[in-house]
Regions:
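A short alpha/beta connector and helix-capping loop motif
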Residues: 146, 165-174
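Long amphipathic alpha-helical scaffold regions
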Residues: 5, 162-164
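Aromatic-lined substrate-binding rim segments of carbohydrate-active enzymes
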Residues: 1-13, 18-19
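Non-cysteine beta-strand/loop elements that form the S-adenosyl-L-methionine
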Residues: 17-21, 77-79, 154-155, 174
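Active-site acidic/histidine proton-transfer and metal-coordination neighborhood
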Residues: 11, 28-157, 164
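Short amphipathic alpha-helical segments and helix-helix/interface helices
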Residues: 2-6, 114, 141-144, 173-174
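Residues at alpha-helix caps and immediate loop-helix transition turns in enzyme cores, especially N-
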Residues: 1, 136-139, 168-169
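Short active-site-adjacent helix-start/loop capping segments
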Residues: 17-18, 25-30
Length: 174
């Protein structure tokens, strides 16, 4: 099946460079305040059930790892989700340890997925984006720390929203 799809695409003079699971990645880690907002990204069968929605999203990412491998791809694009995003502004003050706890949980959710991507020989590239727990270089480095610098946890470079994030699109590469 993958060979057929790749053949159709290549027959049109195009090449598949990566697949994307931005919406499914978002659903791996949803802060409860955003449950209703993000339910629309999931199938009706798992809406209004955060646990089932998360399980569905995790499985979709694992399927995507295999699909990427089947298509001969070595990179895959996604979002990290946002357990901590509602606390990004430091008022009111966050309780001590909240950020560490949040990133430990984020890593716990993503490690099985990262391992599946590793088993399939595919890098998982997170787009740093407003509204995501991975929204800049510092948050990405904290995520790496909690995933023990997982070799498949990579960045997707999309500077289209860097002005909104007050990030210099050239300095960011360094």
């Amino acid at each position: 099946y993958a060979d057929e799809i790749r053949g159709i695409v290549e027959g049109a003079g195009l090449k598949i460079t990566e697949l994307s699971t931005h919406l499914q990645g978002q659903l791996v880690a949803v802060h409860p305040a955003y449950d209703d907002l993000f339910d629309g990204f999931a199938p009706e069968a798992v809406r209004k059930n955060p646990k089932a929605r998360t399980e569905w999203a995790v499985q979709q990412l694992k399927y995507a790892a295999k699909a990427s491998q089947n298509l001969g791809l070595n990179a895959h694009a996604t979002f990290s989700g946002a357990l901590l995003w509602p606390t990004v502004y430091p008022w009111p003050q966050r309780p001590a340890g909240l950020v560490e706890t949040g990133f430990k949980e984020l890593a716990n959710r993503w490690l099985p997925i990262l391992n599946t991507f590793d088993e399939n020989g595919v890098d998982l590239c997170y787009e740093v984006h407003p509204g995501e727990d991975l929204h800049d270089g510092i948050s990405y480095e904290l995520f790496l720390k909690h995933t023990n610098n997982h070799s498949r946890a990579c960045l997707l470079y999309d500077p289209s929203h860097f002005v909104l994030q007050c990030l210099n699109y050239l300095e960011y590469i360094d």
